[in-house]
Amino acid sequence: MNRTARVALALALVVALAGSRAAAAPELEALNGRAIAGGKPMADVVIWLDAPSAPRPRERRFVVHQRNMQFEPRVLVAPVGSTVELPNNDRVFHNVFSFKDGKRFDLGLYPVGTSKFVTFDQPGLSRIFCNIHPTMAAYVMAVDSSLVGVSDADGKLEIAGARPGRYEYHAWRPGAEIISGSLTVSAGREIEVAWP
């Protein structure tokens, strides 16, 4: 796979209306983009922007299922402080753990129909595996930003709440390290993100 990912970012603008008066100044509703590698769409690319003026993300609860000997979803982005439930929906035991970087944990062996919970209290990437089934892998990226997007199977992503301006960005995809840089958000701008 080409180690350069091109992320085309285009702004979606909305106009706020004040009653029957003329439209107010346009405000950015979302930053829409596409992740591409080797001319093909790339899924599971995570991009987040540092914006001190943006509201802090709220802690939430998420679920990463163990189903058909896979984790679903494979990539999850969660605000720091969020709790992830890891239910065993398979017909076999699993032993979910993360030993490197991010949140370190070992949930031990647990049977079908039960769940374990992990709170991701620090920012960073946690690689999650099953001690019994080595082909099972998932990733939880805990971030301190509310401006985050994850590309879908078509490479499309949306960062809700982004406004025009200059940002520090961070980007990651499975199999690569986190890269960082700065970008200016403006209509029709294309950004090239290259992993070393």
Model regions: which residues?
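Bacterial N-terminal signal peptides
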Residues: 8-18
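Bacterial N-terminal signal peptides that target proteins for export
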Residues: 1-9
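Extracytoplasmic copper-binding redox domains, predominantly the cupredoxin/blue-copper superfamily
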Residues: 23-196
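Extended interaction regions within the primary functional domain
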Residues: 1, 16, 193-195
